[in-house]
Amino acid sequence: MAGAKEIRSKIASVQNTQKITKAMEMVAASKMRKSQERMAASRPYAETMRSVIGHLALGNLEYKHPYLEERDVKRVGYLVVSTDRGLCGGLNINLFKRLLAEMKGWSEKGVECDLALIGSKAASFFGSVGGKIVAQVTGMGDNPSLSELIGPVKVMLQAYDEGRLDKLYIVNNKFINTMSQEPRIMQLLPLPPAEDGELKKKSWDYLYEPDPKALLDTLLRRYVESQVYQGVVENLASEQAARMVAMKAATDNGGSLIKELQLVYNKARQASITQELTEIVGGASAV
């Protein structure tokens, strides 16, 4: 059994770690609230844009934009949103497993995959396991801006425009609540039609002024950008929630470990006292 001094040292070490995890839990809780506010502020725009674009996909368009047309699938692209930091439980690895399973399905059909990575964890993971990485951006911090995301988005849209990609998806964690974050793979291009059953029953006619091509080019690009930005802010809220939960679990586990070590310490101290008493009694008997 370890000595009492060694056990006291272990208890002190766990207590110091517990202070760190508690502080990280509180910081993550504060950042999560800010991330939720940012997510809530951008969500109406993203959802409205998705609704409008969904109407367009169902409409009788005088100009059929390439982003609205299905193609034979030979290569697909994924915009993968991950975190820049760790200590957030299985948030990243669960997302990567979901993506790898989907990529395996495409591979079995003879379809190749391109990856545009957002976040250092995705860059590190796919740099190790393999995958065709065509763009990446890292170090966006806790307040990402659309200008920081333009690079990967532009690369993927250019590949789609040139016919090198036939489908484009965004991969991120969807924020459900503080305790639940869900890996999500959402198709961006070609534009999926609106899922609302009532909308599908209607025929939509639009008048475009001055030019439908110029208007749709701009509108559809804004749509993709808005969905990517929303995916990033949702992933950030998911990251902070997962980190808060992970740090709380670490703090609680530290408390349990301290109790166990305290019991071991008490037993060691009791054994030491018993041994001393035995030696004293033995010495007295010898006299």
Curated annotation (Swiss-Prot):
Gene Ontology, cellular component aspect: plasma membrane; proton-transporting ATP synthase complex
The keyword Transferase is annotated on this UniProt entry: no
Summary of the function given for this chain in its UniProt record: Produces ATP from ADP in the presence of a proton gradient across the membrane. The gamma chain is believed to be important in regulating ATPase activity and the flow of protons through the CF(0) complex.
Subunit structure: F-type ATPases have 2 components, CF(1) - the catalytic core - and CF(0) - the membrane proton channel. CF(1) has five subunits: alpha(3), beta(3), gamma(1), delta(1), epsilon(1). CF(0) has three main subunits: a, b and c.
UniProt xrefs under PROSITE patterns: ATPASE_GAMMA
Keywords on record: ATP synthesis, Cell inner membrane, Cell membrane, CF(1), Hydrogen ion transport, Ion transport, Membrane, Transport
Keyword rRNA-binding: no
Gene3D superfamilies attached to this UniProt entry: 3.40.1380.10, ATP synthase, gamma subunit, helix hairpin domain
Family in the record: Belongs to the ATPase gamma chain family.
Taxonomic source organism: Yersinia pestis
Gene Ontology molecular function: ATP binding; proton-transporting ATP synthase activity, rotational mechanism
Protein name: ATP synthase gamma chain
Lineage: Bacteria, Pseudomonadati, Pseudomonadota, Gammaproteobacteria, Enterobacterales
Biological processes annotated in GO: proton motive force-driven ATP synthesis; proton motive force-driven plasma membrane ATP synthesis
Location in the cell: Cell inner membrane
Bilayer topology: Peripheral membrane protein
HAMAP family the record matches: ATP_synth_gamma_bact (MF_00815)
